[in-house]
């Protein structure tokens, strides 16, 4: 959520930065400014009325103490004025509440401001490739490389038909070595991240609306999430939601920062806007597994922590010897809550292209304002909002897809197991 004070003081600058997001969306600050002005006027009116009401109460007590007749005309006149003020104050209360709710609704619908260092652009075509790694692992010959779902079906480790039978489209069942590979990837990733200082969390995978509001999925993306009928509970789209919201409405000590968590969870998404895209395989499912990295940090350290987050996600791909590239997103391709974002894209030889496998975002204080996560420094007055960051470390299904394609040996029809996973799987080939 954006800072209302900033919007009031610098509306033109805020408007210009919002307009950088492009994508055909428009963000009108005028309704916010108008309601904020009306709310402020009501607050001022209430302050004046409350002050006069308090003054009358004291005045009545003083006059009676000085001998005035409690039933006399002077006291009765003051009491009538006091009663009138109470009625006016009571009338103001719902008006202020309504204005506050209107203002909150409009503020929650505004996306985050792009970071000043985020490249300006209109769409993903304007994103900037900042790094490419692993060219030595690219296959010299891609003839005979099958898409990962065909490899999985041939090996009997991906069963799409039964996944659809049990649920519906965009569900799969992992069988035998496929299930073992998924589990091995989860354990490998968690151990690597714990080894560099992340604390593991196993959070709820059902969360309430306040949690989704805090991290920015609600109200804008309600249709992309699965809600439990009859309960204020939603299946999580990412572990970012429960892990970040562990600290909702809390004031942390400065000494606790930075907080670094990793978490494995199943994730659930409707993929409402992807009809007809990636209908086969592991790339775009309604249910998938992911290891997530989440950080809560001091504002002045968030840029450096962001770079470290990207490096931690990269380390997994490097250990697996999977070719990838790092892309910096432009303003027109930023996610709703992100101020700055890097995507890691892994090489899929069957498609002869790179596909996103991790999105590492710095939200600045956008989520912290929504979730009310602050920190306090000893000896100093007041509190500050933390900066939040998160990224996949990594998406398990997409990692498996990349392994199946990059390690597939057409001559034997087998898939070599990456060296770092062989101890987990107790085998060299699938």
Swiss-Prot record:
GO terms for biological process: selenocysteine biosynthetic process; seryl-tRNA aminoacylation. One of its GO terms (molecular function) is serine-tRNA ligase activity. Pathway: Aminoacyl-tRNA biosynthesis; selenocysteinyl-tRNA(Sec) biosynthesis; L-seryl-tRNA(Sec) from L-serine and tRNA(Sec): step 1/1. It is an enzyme of class 6 (ligase). HAMAP family: Ser_tRNA_synth_type1 (MF_00176). Consists of two distinct domains, a catalytic core and a N-terminal extension that is involved in tRNA binding. This is Serine--tRNA ligase. It comes from Synechocystis sp. (strain ATCC 27184 / PCC 6803 / Kazusa).
